[in-house]
Amino acid sequence: MLQGKIAIVTGGAKGIGRYASHTLAQAGATVVIVDVDVERMHKTLGELRDLKFEAWAVAADVRHEDEVRRMVHQVVERFGQIDVLLNDAGIVPHFNWGIPRWPRVRFLSKDFWDSVIQTNLGGTFLCTKYVVPFMESRRAGNIVNLWGGGRAENHGAAAYVVSKDAIRTFTRFVAEEEREWNVCVVAFSPKQAIATEDAPEEARNRLPGPECLGNGFVLAAQAGMNLTGKTVEHRDGNIVAID
């Protein structure tokens, strides 16, 4: 389905990003894992290569423009194109794991607020900024922005929810800017809380894992222009717009 496609997955070393890396590779894409956690990045890269999938990895912190610029140019120098960008890298509150670890607004430091916004929203912006020129040059491409958790209402989730709701708005604006270039931009919603491999055992027993997303990322990576600017979710083997 994605044979011959080059797919960048930010935050691709663990959690939902790791699952996306596996499913995109299984669908035939050459997956480029981008992560700040170098050890986990190489572990996931090894998993893909052990399965005989085409994969590569670049260490980068998506908060930093120079690192994002370097990463994108390294990918283009090696592969000559970028077909899919999955913006997954993010800082996530795990309230559904029973760990209320983030403070309410009155106790929230500006440094922490900045870290969440710069990673979740700023990283999505920077990766998109540097990838779209290469998609425009080929008049083709798919950008998938993870929107998971945007509906959270837990005390202490303000920074996260603000970043995710801003990503939906960002998706709509970039979709309109890139429409003439045939670049499809969607926000992808997992629909529910997901327990990844780092979750406590209790949470993994109670909540679904990333496998519940099925082939959602593969379908989102092939979304047509009729869906550009929309928030989509995986449902019964298809992706459907929810806004």
Regions found by a protein language model. Give the residues of each.
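A short, exposed helix-loop element centered on a Lys and neighboring polar residues
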Residues: 128-129, 172
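Active-site loop of short-chain dehydrogenase/reductase
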Residues: 5, 53-54, 81-82, 135-147, ...
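Catalytic loop of short-chain dehydrogenase/reductase
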Residues: 104-110, 142-166, 171-172, 176-179, ...
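Canonical Rossmann dinucleotide-binding motif of NAD(H)/NADP(H)-dependent dehydrogenases/reductases
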Residues: 2-32
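Substrate-binding pocket helix/loop in short-chain dehydrogenase/reductase
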Residues: 96-105, 112-114
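C-terminal helical subdomain
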Residues: 180-183, 187-191, 202-243
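The beta1-alpha1 cofactor-binding region of Rossmann-like NAD(H)/NADP(H)-dependent oxidoreductases
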Residues: 38-39, 59-73, 110
